[in-house]
Amino acid sequence: MHSMILRNKPHGFIQCLILYLLVNIIQESPWARGDASGDSHQAVRVFIFAGQSNMEGADSNKDHIQRFPPFRGLDQPQLDVPFWYCLGRENKNRSQGWTTLQPVGSLVGPELSFAAHLKPELSGSLAIIKCAAGGTHLGGDWNPDQPSGFKMYPLLLQEVREALGQLTAQGVTYRLEGLVWHQGENDMFVPEYMARYGDHLIGFMDRLRQDLKAPQLPVFIGELCTKTIWGMDLRPRMYAISQGQKKAAAVDKHAFYVRNAHVGVEMGQPVGLHYHYGTLGQLEQGVEFAEAYLRHLGKGRKGNPSLSKWPYKEGETVRLFILAGHRNMEGEWAFVQDLESDDGARDWRRPISEVAFKYTLGGGVWQSNGWEALSPAGLYGTFGPEVSFGHVMQEALSGPMGMLKVTHSGSQIIDWTPEGSEAKDRHFYPVWIACIQEAVADLEACGHPVDLAGVFYHLGENDMSFGPYRRQAVSRLKRLMEQTRADLKAPELDWFVSQQPPTDQEALNRLNVTAELTELAAADPHLTHIKVFDLPQQDRLLIGTEGIVALGKRLAETYLQSR
């Protein structure tokens, strides 16, 4: 097989020598290996990445990658992954031919973690072609029939054809393996485009397959993250786009809807909300796209094993603790790799097989394998306060205890209310109550009476930064507690509600959530208000590893003091 060469031809002896060395390196590189199926043609898997700003990598920074342990090193070139790109609107940033996969300038895109996540799972090589520009519409710029504005559809075809043409010219056998698509935010602002997003996406996919002569090209459609400010102030519009995406995935057997509502989101100034994913969100959505592709191949991520030995004796009553919430309860900024042993010599990473642990994270994106030993179990190497909470409680209490964790970091409090909102697919209360009922039923089926020891809920972070939601935060929490108690037939179910410092901004400060919650707790003998205003490692809305450990310990200590 011939190697791939760069578009710009070198001149002079030194340049020719460099090219000669590169050619020989590439001939020994993954370009020359077979694919996972043992294809005799040694086809390279080529993926196309396309979309707008949250595909481009807006508001990301390659220097921030080191903050997030699972992704450290992705600021460096991935020498075994060829990369072709054209980014931007008026002023295009082009690779000028095939280059090595790495951040483009300071931008971090999902392709970095996508490739890194796939390489250990696949034999053979892969390559990425990327064409993206912020502020573009599927109804206009990406419209294959009547492209307008920045005419992204013909640009995409031009870039893909030229990139593939260079591979063909050099004798590289390739296989178009999928389109990774993240777009839709801008179509929200044009009523016609918003209403017809699903039809436009179906037409776009059909036409692209036709133009590329790839009739079965898989398309991985990235969900718009509801953790952004637009997930609140533009909730109905975001919902409309999501319905269009789901419609396209439902009618097209080669299209797949990729859930992204739980991935990280950049924190903006001054109140911590943003509409771009930033560095962490880009890297996490890259993993989700890779996992979607692996599921397409019949593979996919595997979780922790179920308990090998049931920790309770038949007939024993199990005290069940329920942890719930949004971004910090899920553990968005808390990483296992940053965990250090406690001053009391506790090893937070050590599984506790005496505590059965069940969880549903990211609104159901990640779930336990039945009951597991209590241990860090979040996506992307994250964990929540359940780890330190469980260690402290297990040491302090006698008798069997179990834990259930139910979180959705892409939700707001309204999603947890029994009424929900106009965004019907985001209604989380039915999931919440079903998780508790199923956990109780599981334990009872194993012969254990269940004592619901309490719900430990961390008040929604995003709600504190958006006036209309902050205004109704406590009343919505009250509805959640009331309906949960009613549905579980547990009118005296204890709630422990932790509250971090609410967003400090002049207009928002007129809404005194702390006072409202204090008043609610005074009127409810089964509600404990826990003010955690001194946690370490808090930056605006999010709490880091040390702070999440401290939060779990504080929750446990509050419960123990209340007994």
Please give the residue ranges for each predicted region.
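Composition-driven detection of intrinsically disordered, low-complexity segments
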Residues: 12-14, 32-33
